[in-house]
Amino acid sequence: MMEDDGQPRTLYVGNLSRDVTEVLILQLFSQIGPCKSCKMITEHTSNDPYCFVEFYEHRDAAAALAAMNGRKILGKEVKVNWATTPSSQKKDTSNHFHVFVGDLSPEITTEDIKSAFAPFGKISDARVVKDMATGKSKGYGFVSFYNKLDAENAIVHMGGQWLGGRQIRTNWATRKPPAPKSTQENNTKQLRFEDVVNQSSPKNCTVYCGGIASGLTDQLMRQTFSPFGQIMEIRVFPEKGYSFVRFSTHESAAHAIVSVNGTTIEGHVVKCYWGKESPDMTKNFQQVDYSQWGQWSQVYGNPQQYGQYMANGWQVPPYGVYGQPWNQQGFGVDQSPSAAWMGGFGAQPPQGQAPPPVIPPPNQAGYGMASYQTQ
């Protein structure tokens, strides 16, 4: 359960013997740190009793969690974990100012990012997003401030700073507005990182982004894709409404495809997928085999859901490596006033249709990214 400063201090202690009492629990846990209370829950069923132990200090609760989980009390191995707060009691941070923090090292914790951003003002919430199955960090998180100016300063001064061996990326995280009913019904398909990263060669670092009929610029693409990794090259074709973005790593490109596909940029729902690259990257534009779309539609045809930032109906953008079940409204990264990060998914080519062909101009010979052919 969360206190006013956001630090949990209450532990759940389960799988208890029916002979265990509140007094005994307090005696044992007080050896680690001063306890405020203990509440024993004994249900009139076959289930074992459990209790909640509240400490005065978060550090004592954390120490007790590490020390007591798996220990035997009166012959039974107890289970200790952080007590969860019912969603109805969660702090409402919907009107606070949320900062997206990307490119986090795997070892970075919620406490680490909270400490790093604390100098900029009072923080209402902070979270490193984790894979719900493995417990590993997905490489990004969020920090919420009470004050907008504090959040702005944090974005400006923390972007590019080193944290745990990596330069982090910061930007606004904005709440995704409800989609129209028709959009919700027709565009529910979501991409998973595990599927996308394996759809192309590990040497392929190029993303195709299409569907931007107006306002397409190099700067817009850089703002849109920079949170996902180092960009090596950008080629835009404004008259065609699409662009190619080449990253330094295959994984960064996969993150970008998963996160940007189906989002709204300059008022247009965009489509992102791999640009096909040949083993010899010095050759001219290579053609993308659009028969892959049949495979993609099968792979991505089942609705997927993602691990969420569990605070008042907010959700993280699927920026991380592992997608996990959840089903709420979405966080997105606001890239610019005119290109809001919408975090949505689902735009797919109509059946039997291929995206428009890319015809490289003569002065672009040797450009080793990707082009597309019709079937």
From Swiss-Prot:
<dbReference type="InterPro" id="IPR035979">
    <property type="entry name" value="RBD_domain_sf"/>
</dbReference>
<dbReference type="GO" id="GO:0005634">
    <property type="term" value="C:nucleus"/>
</dbReference>
<feature type="compositionally biased region" description="Pro residues">
    <location>
        <begin position="352"/>
        <end position="363"/>
    </location>
</feature>
<dbReference type="GO" id="GO:2000637">
    <property type="term" value="P:positive regulation of miRNA-mediated gene silencing"/>
</dbReference>
<dbReference type="GO" id="GO:0005737">
    <property type="term" value="C:cytoplasm"/>
</dbReference>
<dbReference type="Pfam" id="PF00076">
    <property type="entry name" value="RRM_1"/>
</dbReference>
<dbReference type="InterPro" id="IPR003954">
    <property type="entry name" value="RRM_dom_euk"/>
</dbReference>
<keyword id="KW-0677">Repeat</keyword>
<dbReference type="InterPro" id="IPR034496">
    <property type="entry name" value="TIAR_RRM3"/>
</dbReference>
<comment type="function">
    <text>RNA-binding protein involved in alternative pre-RNA splicing and in cytoplasmic stress granules formation. Shows a preference for uridine-rich RNAs. Activates splicing of alternative exons with weak 5' splice sites followed by a U-rich stretch on its own pre-mRNA and on TIA1 mRNA. Promotes the inclusion of TIA1 exon 5 to give rise to the long isoform (isoform a) of TIA1. Acts downstream of the stress-induced phosphorylation of EIF2S1/EIF2A to promote the recruitment of untranslated mRNAs to cytoplasmic stress granules (SG).</text>
</comment>
<feature type="domain" description="RRM 3">
    <location>
        <begin position="205"/>
        <end position="277"/>
    </location>
</feature>
<dbReference type="GO" id="GO:0035332">
    <property type="term" value="P:positive regulation of hippo signaling"/>
</dbReference>
<keyword id="KW-0053">Apoptosis</keyword>
<dbReference type="GO" id="GO:0005764">
    <property type="term" value="C:lysosome"/>
</dbReference>
<feature type="domain" description="RRM 1">
    <location>
        <begin position="9"/>
        <end position="85"/>
    </location>
</feature>
<dbReference type="GO" id="GO:0005654">
    <property type="term" value="C:nucleoplasm"/>
</dbReference>
<feature type="region of interest" description="Disordered">
    <location>
        <begin position="345"/>
        <end position="375"/>
    </location>
</feature>
<keyword id="KW-0539">Nucleus</keyword>
<dbReference type="GO" id="GO:0010494">
    <property type="term" value="C:cytoplasmic stress granule"/>
</dbReference>
<protein>
    <recommendedName>
        <fullName>Nucleolysin TIAR</fullName>
    </recommendedName>
</protein>
<feature type="modified residue" description="N6-acetyllysine">
    <location>
        <position position="122"/>
    </location>
</feature>
<dbReference type="GO" id="GO:0005829">
    <property type="term" value="C:cytosol"/>
</dbReference>
<comment type="subunit">
    <text>Interacts with FASTK.</text>
</comment>
<dbReference type="GO" id="GO:0006357">
    <property type="term" value="P:regulation of transcription by RNA polymerase II"/>
</dbReference>
<dbReference type="InterPro" id="IPR000504">
    <property type="entry name" value="RRM_dom"/>
</dbReference>
<dbReference type="GO" id="GO:0006915">
    <property type="term" value="P:apoptotic process"/>
</dbReference>
<dbReference type="GO" id="GO:0003677">
    <property type="term" value="F:DNA binding"/>
</dbReference>
<dbReference type="GO" id="GO:0008285">
    <property type="term" value="P:negative regulation of cell population proliferation"/>
</dbReference>
<dbReference type="GO" id="GO:0140517">
    <property type="term" value="F:protein-RNA adaptor activity"/>
</dbReference>
<dbReference type="InterPro" id="IPR034492">
    <property type="entry name" value="TIAR_RRM1"/>
</dbReference>
<keyword id="KW-0458">Lysosome</keyword>
<dbReference type="GO" id="GO:0044194">
    <property type="term" value="C:cytolytic granule"/>
</dbReference>
<keyword id="KW-0007">Acetylation</keyword>
<dbReference type="GO" id="GO:0003730">
    <property type="term" value="F:mRNA 3'-UTR binding"/>
</dbReference>
<dbReference type="InterPro" id="IPR012677">
    <property type="entry name" value="Nucleotide-bd_a/b_plait_sf"/>
</dbReference>
<keyword id="KW-0963">Cytoplasm</keyword>
<dbReference type="GO" id="GO:0006952">
    <property type="term" value="P:defense response"/>
</dbReference>
<dbReference type="GO" id="GO:0003723">
    <property type="term" value="F:RNA binding"/>
</dbReference>
<dbReference type="InterPro" id="IPR034494">
    <property type="entry name" value="TIAR_RRM2"/>
</dbReference>
<keyword id="KW-0597">Phosphoprotein</keyword>
<feature type="domain" description="RRM 2">
    <location>
        <begin position="97"/>
        <end position="175"/>
    </location>
</feature>
<keyword id="KW-0694">RNA-binding</keyword>
